[in-house]
Regions:
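Conserved, mostly hydrophobic/aromatic
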Residues: 16, 49, 57, 117
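A short, N-terminal amphipathic alpha-helix
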Residues: 41-53, 85-88
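Glycine-rich, proline-tolerant flexible connector loops at the mouths of alpha/beta enzymes
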Residues: 53-78, 124-129
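Alpha-helix N-cap and loop-to-helix initiation/capping positions
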Residues: 30-41, 70-78, 130-134
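Alpha-helix-loop-beta-strand connector modules within alpha/beta enzyme cores
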Residues: 3, 10-11, 16-17, 68-96, ...
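Active-site mouth loops of central-metabolism enzymes
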Residues: 19-44, 94-101, 157-162
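Ligand-binding beta-strand-loop-alpha-helix segment within the catalytic cores
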Residues: 86-87, 93-96, 100, 108, ...
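Conserved anion-binding
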Residues: 20-23, 104, 108-162
Length: 162
């Protein structure tokens, strides 16, 4: 049995994206609207996606622009807070993606109980934010050190924007 069938329940899963708005620490964060607004937008998307019949959902900091390869702690803390607030409403398997930090993605998955992650885990790239070495050896060791072996890894083979 494939991990998709095991974790999500089907071999051809529809994994929908729940793109998080800019959060504390991001240049585009709206402090007047605050995290309550970010969480409300996520809630609305989550409910719409689940009601639409998707098999799974993945939370990503899509609006943490410009992206970084070593994400600040405030980003992961904000994502964990938001996902924690929504956890009781999540009725389908879920994953996370902290753009573009493989270690922090695993940290978030472990902290919030995600079933899987998606990240760029292989290769070296030139991008709009400079040279980027994914250093999967470090990520694999980190995964072991935080006991996240049960978290499934989805590899992006070629990152968009490179």
């Amino acid at each position: 049995m494939s991990w998709l069938k095991e974790v999500i329940g089907t071999e051809k899963a529809i994994i929908a994206m729940c793109h998080m708005q800019a959060m504390p620490g991001d240049p585009g964060y709206d402090g007047q609207k605050g995290m309550d607004w970010v969480i409300k937008k996520m809630y609305d998307d989550l409910i719409a996606l689940q009601n639409g019949g998707v098999d799974s959902v993945m939370f990503s900091n899509e609006f943490s622009l410009p992206y970084m390869t070593k994400v600040d702690t405030i980003t992961v803390a904000s994502m964990a807070t938001a996902i924690g607030e929504l956890k009781r409403y999540i009725k389908i398997p879920f994953g996370v993606n902290v753009l573009w930090d493989g270690e922090k993605t695993l940290d978030l998955a472990k902290a919030c109980g995600a079933d899987f992650v998606r990240e760029i885990y292989s290769g070296v790239y030139a991008s709009d934010f400079g040279m980027w070495n994914t250093d999967f050896g470090r990520v694999a060791r980190h995964r072991k050190s935080i006991d996240a072996g049960n978290v499934k890894l989805i590899f992006n083979i070629l990152p968009e924007g490179c």
